């Protein structure tokens, strides 16, 4: 009974945090606004267009041009309603699907070729629990836009149920989704990208770590060596599980960054559900991961109410801070924190670095 009550509380928190619409196209005869091209790979079946909740053992690849409205506010997704308007809503300006992963790689190379060599980084975003295809697509478009990321974004949409009551289904889907992410990483690391960065949120962190582990165990060092960094945001991973994954991977991609918040109510409820207070995204002390070369970024000070499960993407103040840093990758590494590129307190414990960001110091 207690578990059912906690699940209901999780559902209420996650559904009350924001309105979520769906995908809609720019109406015929209207001009798109600011365009962000987003490549995608998904292991969702096309049971309900665009992509539903059922699992597919094969991947579908494509490209979507996302139109971002001029009224956009940092940290938000302006969802379309019954009357989609490119001046007010996130919309699809154009869509394209590829026959296979090689086709997507060719399309990716075309986009990369138009960029300055220093801007040819590719970011692979892996969404979290309770996400639909549209959530992951629009979220990486929003983050890329708000942070002014110069590279190319790819979203991996694994078959989450998009329902806060289906946590068990999503946990199983996270394991199911490993092969699809592995295939995507293989294709992207064969592209002309200068470097490949993995960014994952919540339960997507489990998908990411399991996939990195599989790459190492299978001996795919080519793909692993092309990964220039990993960012886990509010990771929903048991600490002991994470340690076994990290041990199997061996030398972690550098930088390896974890964003956390002690006010993350979603992870706190999951800890109560599992009766274990050891989620990676809510550690009390960086000593827990001191043996690993990791930068643990505490963004508790940027919590703004609600469930606080995604402040890195939703806090306007934090987005503004990160967006103003000239070299964000260096700033979020341990050395960057010590050189004062970001405001806050830096603690070093063995191999790990804790960076506690301070909005007061940033004024």
Predicted regions and their residues:
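Short substrate-entry loop that stabilizes the transition state in hydrolases
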Residues: 131-136
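Short catalytic micro-motifs in class I SAM-dependent methyltransferases
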Residues: 127-128, 210, 234
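Gly/Ala-rich beta-loop-alpha elbow adjacent to hydrolase catalytic centers
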Residues: 181, 200, 204, 208
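Bacterial N-terminal signal peptides that target proteins for export
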Residues: 1-7
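The conserved beta1-alpha1 loop
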Residues: 124-128, 201
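Alpha/beta-hydrolase fold active-site loops
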Residues: 121
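C-terminal motif of bacterial Sec signal peptides marking the signal peptidase cleavage site
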Residues: 13-16
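Lipolytic serine-hydrolase domain surface
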Residues: 18, 22-98, 106-112, 116, ...
């Amino acid at each position: 009974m207690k578990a059912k009550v906690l699940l209901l509380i999780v559902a209420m928190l996650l559904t009350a945090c924001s309105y979520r619409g769906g995908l809609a196209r720019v109406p015929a005869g209207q001009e798109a606004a600011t365009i962000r091209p987003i490549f995608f790979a998904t292991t969702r079946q096309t049971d309900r267009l665009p992509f539903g909740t059922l699992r597919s053992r094969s991947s579908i690849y494509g490209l979507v041009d996302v139109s971002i409205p001029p009224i956009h506010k940092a940290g938000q997704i302006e969802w379309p309603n019954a009357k989609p308007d490119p001046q007010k809503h996130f919309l699809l300006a154009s869509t394209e699907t590829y026959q296979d992963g090689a086709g997507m790689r060719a399309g990716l190379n075309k986009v990369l070729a138009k960029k300055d060599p220093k801007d040819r980084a590719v970011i692979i975003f892996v969404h979290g629990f309770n996400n639909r295809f549209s959530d992951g697509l629009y979220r990486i478009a929003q983050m890329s836009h708000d942070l002014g990321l110069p590279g190319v974004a790819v979203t991996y949409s694994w078959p989450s149920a998009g329902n806060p009551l289906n946590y068990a289904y999503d946990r199983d889907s996270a394991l199911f989704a490993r092969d699809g992410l592995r295939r995507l990483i293989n294709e992207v690391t064969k592209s002309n990208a200068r470097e490949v960065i993995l960014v994952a949120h919540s339960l997507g962190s489990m998908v990411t770590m399991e996939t990195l582990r599989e790459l190492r165990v299978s001996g795919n060092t080519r793909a692993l060596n092309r990964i220039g960094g990993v960012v886990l945001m509010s990771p929903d991973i048991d600490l002991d599980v994470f340690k076994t994954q990290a041990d199997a991977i061996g030398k972690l991609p550098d930088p390896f960054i974890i964003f956390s918040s002690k006010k993350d109510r979603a992870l706190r409820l999951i800890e109560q559900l599992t009766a274990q207070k050891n989620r990676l995204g809510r550690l009390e002390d960086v000593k827990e991961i001191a043996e690993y070369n990791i930068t643990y970024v505490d963004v508790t000070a940027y919590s703004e109410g609600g469930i606080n499960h995604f402040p890195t993407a939703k806090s306007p103040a934090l987005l503004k801070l990160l967006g103003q840093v000239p070299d964000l990758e260096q700033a979020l590494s341990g050395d960057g924190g010590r050189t004062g590129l970001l405001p806050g307190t830096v603690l070093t414990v063995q191999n790990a670095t804790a960076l506690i960001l301070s909005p007061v110091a940033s004024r």
